[in-house]
């Protein structure tokens, strides 16, 4: 299948296989691949650009051993350690972000899951946010139980985030304290309750292009419409501290393939993009990135909101209040 044939097939509503995607990844004409992804982005998603922000509401001392993560208690890193933030601080940040035109605000906590006592504080915080702002609330709190997810949903959280992080076949190489099956159980339960799902991963953790394609196809089959894509930023003290940063062309090829495989999804700039040159960031936006977490991130440098808005609009996007994945 040529790049042109793949593009036309997708534009007509077809899907490409993992084998076809891998063949396209190896095609020497990268610019043609990038342009095909751009046309698919515009055809299915228009020029809408979706923004969200997060707050690291509980940091460090995590029981899990994810090899990339600064917050794992298994490794000695320079991450700040603190318990669950008080409601007042979270509410302040939510209101502040909404005033900057950001659509959604996520509370993110370290750990395998929050305790029931912590969840009581979190749901109270969410209700306070909803009383003081019209910002939409999201949460990323690990492998919550069904009853915990239900309480979170009832408090006003609409979207639940749980990354699969990498290809299902590769996950066990990166984490031994929980499984991809546990992640998927959480995601399926959250969806059954009524949450919209945000799920993606980290690129550049030693996985092959074939495994990235596996992840992209897995997310497509799961019907995920918000896919955060992080670029690994090696954290000193973690097992991945000496991992070589991904070549920018390989990152761009990955974005193009995620777009071809997930034509209807918001592909979201997330952690690590500050490592990319401005040229590559702009090219990522041209190819298929059409959403972003903006502001401060969890344990890496985030972005300045106004500078990001200029960047996104200069690449032809319109910052929108309404995004299809929220319907």
From Swiss-Prot:
Enzyme Commission code = 2.8.1.6
Q: What pathway is this protein said to act in by its record?
A: Cofactor biosynthesis; biotin biosynthesis; biotin from 7,8-diaminononanoate: step 2/2
Which positions are annotated as binding [4Fe-4S] cluster?
62, 66, 69
Presence of keyword Protein transport: no
Record's SUPFAM superfamilies? Radical SAM enzymes (SSF102114)
**Catalytic activity field:** (4R,5S)-dethiobiotin + (sulfur carrier)-SH + 2 reduced [2Fe-2S]-[ferredoxin] + 2 S-adenosyl-L-methionine = (sulfur carrier)-H + biotin + 2 5'-deoxyadenosine + 2 L-methionine + 2 oxidized [2Fe-2S]-[ferredoxin]
Q: Which cofactor does it need?
A: [4Fe-4S] cluster; [2Fe-2S] cluster
Q: Which residues bind [2Fe-2S] cluster?
A: 138, 198, 268
Q: Relay the cofactor remark from the entry.
A: Binds 1 [4Fe-4S] cluster. The cluster is coordinated with 3 cysteines and an exchangeable S-adenosyl-L-methionine.
Subunit details: Homodimer.
- What does this protein's UniProt record list under function? Catalyzes the conversion of dethiobiotin (DTB) to biotin by the insertion of a sulfur atom into dethiobiotin via a radical-based mechanism.
**Family to which this protein belongs:** Belongs to the radical SAM superfamily. Biotin synthase family.
Question: What protein does this entry describe?
Answer: Biotin synthase
- Annotated gene: bioB
